[in-house]
């Protein structure tokens, strides 16, 4: 099962936490749709800010949004202008009071979503897929990863028939629950069609009582 299941969901409750931290009874569907709208809006609004994860917490009529990004300065803006504008936009979108926390990702080369997104953008820029994948793997291993696996699927280099190419370095123990494995799936929209990019990064083992995080510094607005 470890080879098939999403590694992030497989480890929730063991070494990972939920990205949506709230409970609802009859309003569950409304809150879930609101979460999806918030995530989609932030993804579109901060497309160039290297945003990896958006965590949402709820309390009464208040929504706390934590944005994990490798470029906190771009999200915050000069004197906090950008994050304040974003907060007002989310207030209008949800009709609730929104509080935004900016969490800096200290090592973006160890974040699967940012690595996969980087590979996807290079594929869109017509860079050879092998070069993009191997470059990302080398940077991740230099940053301290214990192992990394990347996979690209689709009409590679414009070939008539789609295929899957994958490369790995180090070890990626998918069956080990205490293994801190970050996983991401991204898309590259090329002139030949859509390419799927999957990334697995093994960052070491974690005790179940200690939830590992790639984010060290946190600021709020």
UniProtKB/Swiss-Prot annotation:
The keyword Glycoprotein does not apply. CDD domains: KH-II_30S_S3 (cd02412). Residues 38-106 form the KH type-2 domain. InterPro entries: KH_dom (IPR004087), KH_dom-like_a/b (IPR015946), KH_dom_type_2 (IPR004044), KH_sf_prok-type (IPR009019), Ribosomal_S3_C_sf (IPR036419), Ribosomal_uS3_bac-typ (IPR005704), Ribosomal_uS3_C (IPR001351), Ribosomal_uS3_CS (IPR018280). GO terms for molecular function: mRNA binding; rRNA binding; structural constituent of ribosome. Gene3D superfamilies: 3.30.300.20, Ribosomal protein S3, C-terminal domain. Binds the lower part of the 30S subunit head. Binds mRNA in the 70S ribosome, positioning it for translation. Part of the 30S ribosomal subunit. Forms a tight complex with proteins S10 and S14. Belongs to the universal ribosomal protein uS3 family. This is Small ribosomal subunit protein uS3.
